[in-house]
Amino acid sequence: MRIGYTGWTWISNERDNWNPINERHKENFEQFLKEVSDLGYETVENFNWIADYYSDDIEGFKNVVQKYNLKFENLYFYFSDNPDKDYEEAKKYLEFMKSVDAHYMNMQGVMWTDTPYQRPTNKEQILSYARLSDKIGRLCKEYGVKACMHPHANTAVFTKEQIDLYMENTNPEYVFLCIDTAHTTLAGIDAPELVREYGKRIGYMHLKDIDPDETLNTEWPMKRFRPLGCGCVNFKGVVNELRNAGYDDILCVELDYQPVCNYRSAQISREYIHNVLGL
């Protein structure tokens, strides 16, 4: 398994509704690469807007990633309320991915920010996402890319019931699952058990921890996310189940909110992966 890190938190401001920290996007992206390379990470990913920042400088993108001996592998793609637009956007981003030799596209449903955060299952919305995912997944396969749905808090695909409905209605030839260990736990799902159930359909993994204290950050529960080893996720169980399923792809670490700074979070997680998980 290769160990990766996601870089959007070096570019987006967690204290300003995730707007860009400044206009020096490429400098911030390079700082991310420099730091995670220093810590021994092997692969990187980013949200799809990184492709827009480098749309006129593909060679510059490839060169800066190679400069730090990293491999860019995943572009994170958000659905909107317009499936036709999403499909056309996916085409555009797949061209970028082809040009930089990336092999995974995470997909996520539209996220709401108003309460209630957890809502009843919206079968119609999930089936709509499933149809769109099959279309994008079929296209991804033509590009040599795995399309992976990322269940996420405050979206229509989050709970076990919602994940099951989505997976039952997508083609396993075209659509895979990206399990995020913290979002899974936040949804009340045991992460190793979910890996065991969907092992053969897992195409990508997001690793982050979560504080089990549900009284914390009730105004925005995702602020309970933590570096690896600082919460309650059973990562040994997750890795064991991945091995049992024959998974040998990427384990990508991510953390939305930093206890100190991005570098320190990435360092804590990398040390945990090495010292505790033996990877």
Regions found by a protein language model. Name each.
Residues E14-K26, Y117-P120, T185-D248, Y257-V260, ...:
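Gly/Pro-rich active-site loop or hairpin
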Residues K67-K71, N82-L177, K236, Y263:
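Active-site acidic/histidine proton-transfer and metal-coordination neighborhood
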Residues M1-Y104, K123, K141, P172, ...:
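N-terminal pre-domain/capping segments
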Residues W10-N13, F79-N82, M111-P116, D211-E214:
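Conserved radical SAM core fold
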Residues G4-W8, A102-G109, R201-P212:
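Non-cysteine beta-strand/loop elements that form the S-adenosyl-L-methionine
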Residues T43-V44, E73, D134-C232:
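Acidic/histidine-rich catalytic cores of soluble enzymes
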Residues T43, Y104, Y204, D249-I250:
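Residues at the N-termini of beta-strands
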Residues N46-I58, Y78-E88, T113-Y117, A153-T159, ...:
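Acidic-and-aromatic substrate-binding clefts and catalytic sites of carbohydrate-active enzymes
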